[in-house]
Amino acid sequence: MSLLENNIRKICKDWKVNSVAADLHCHTKMSDGSASIDEVVLMAKKLGLKTIAVTDHDTFAGATRACVYGRRQGIEVIHGAEISCIDSARGRKVHILCYLCQNPDRLEGVFKRTKERRQRAAALMLQKVMRQYPITPDMVSRRAQGSTNIYKQHIMHALLDAGYTNEIFGDLFRSLFHPREGSAYASVEYPEVTEIVPKIHEAGGLAVLAHPAVYDSYDVMEELLPLGLDGVEVWHPRNHPDDPERLSGFCREHGLIMTGGTDFHGLYTKKPNPLGTCTTGDDQVELMKKRCEKYRKQTPRADKQ
């Protein structure tokens, strides 16, 4: 047994989840998660999860690598990404989960623009933090190693290493990065959500609205229906008690796919949410694949155009 597998065994202990369940919302070190791609796949295997989706922010790189490693470990990895958007009419963030994209290259332009904007914001935030605390770019880069970008969590981890906090999310995080009051906050310009859903379909992917309760996305959920919204993330750790019933009712009324996911970030989370906390049933995973197959027939491959 490798050292990595032994460490994962210790983490997982005896906790098991339903072997037919799928956790369709997982982040890795490729974006703002603390666990590597291999670690996430091995955790899923030890927990008895049959299927996971790797959905790093604004990149398919994590999912592509996870699919390869998942096959070696006997874990089905659904290719995905979580796309950061804005609902400018209401001034709110919106996240769209893209699954099973047939032509991922068609979304690379969107990802590249977001990456560049996020890099500019991260550089500005880091400069502001370094004026207040004696951390260095190398300390932050070490924590961001393997990621497509520097995220606020990486800066906080450097501050934790330096002894200025004992938690990633807490009073110090709020004082630095609160959108209105944070002394080091810098905003990122994101694409309009009404533009992203059609782009996902043009690329042959499924568009699922992520965690509506987190960003109060209920109004935009209705507006995305005419654009062909495929599904809604019904089960999420940050739901309010009545959210699953409300969201599942909406999905049944409009014939939408119902997904569930932990929004796994490892250490980088406000409350402990181990992999498999929220899951998707086998029936919905099969529905996703059937709908994707329909899109596959409708969407010409980029290499055949």
Question: For the regions a protein language model found, what residue spans apply to each?
Answer:
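A short acidic, helix-capping loop that chelates divalent metal ions and anchors anionic groups
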Residues: 106, 269-271
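An N-terminally biased module of ancient metal coordination in phosphate/nucleic-acid-related enzymes
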Residues: 1-93, 176-181, 185, 191-210, ...
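Conserved, well-ordered active-site substructure
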Residues: 273-283
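Extended substrate/RNA-proximal surfaces in nucleic-acid metabolism proteins
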Residues: 2, 6-13, 71-219, 282-303
